A protein has these predicted regions:
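Ferredoxin-reductase
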Residues: 1-23, 32, 39, 70-74, ...
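C-terminal helical cap/extension that packs against the catalytic core
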Residues: 8-10, 65, 72-125, 130-133, ...
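Short, conserved phosphate/pyrophosphate- and ester-handling motifs at nucleotide-, phospho-/glycolipid
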Residues: 19, 48, 127
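General small-molecule cofactor/ligand-binding pocket signal
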Residues: 23, 94-98, 149-151
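Conserved beta-strand elements of the Class I
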Residues: 39-43, 123
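Histidine-anchored nucleotide/phosphate-binding helix
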Residues: 49-60
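Short, flexible loop segments at boundaries between secondary-structure elements
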Residues: 72, 139-156
Length: 156
């Protein structure tokens, strides 16, 4: 499971020992359910990669997807080895794993240019600060609001 400790409830999951039986429900979101079938840009910040990973594990991609996975270091990059293997196996998946130990990545350098975003649906999942900065930049690069889909992870 990929559960980040963000508050009282999720912090308890970090101390559960291996082998302990637990009953969990969810996830309940519909974040990626409304994909249009055209090209997509997926932007994941840290453990925000999990909804994208769930899709990649269960079905082949029917359209081109560029996944930009932002993380602090390769040691902290959850599921990076699996994502790299999936990118090699899936012809429609392009993976860019970008480490930035200093916090916020250089989004203007990492995100695609405006010409590469025409007709692309953008799906973002990560910390609120990253989402706000990425959405603002994508909008300045011409991405219409109806093509921006965000999933924050702030369950506490």
């Amino acid at each position: 499971l990929g559960i980040k400790a963000l508050g009282d409830c999720t912090r308890h999951f970090q101390s559960v020992e291996c082998g302990v039986a637990a009953r969990l429900q969810g996830p309940f979101g519909t974040f990626l359910a409304g994909q249009t079938g055209g090209p997509s840009l997926w932007i994941a910040g840290g453990i925000g990669v999990t909804p994208f990973l769930a899709v990649l594990r269960t079905q082949p991609l029917p359209q081109p997807v560029r996944l930009i996975y932002l993380h602090r270091s390769s040691r902290d990059a959850a599921y990076l080895d699996e994502l790299q293997a999936l990118a090699e196996a899936q012809p429609y998946l392009s993976l860019a794993a970008v480490a930035n130990a200093d916090g916020m990545p250089d989004l203007p350098a990492v995100l695609p240019a405006a010409a590469d975003l025409v007709g692309v649906d953008c799906y973002l999942c990560g910390p609120p600060g990253l989402l706000m900065a990425a959405v603002a930049l994508l909008q300045t690069r011409g991405v219409a609001p109806h093509r921006l889909h965000c999933e924050r992870f702030d369950f506490r």
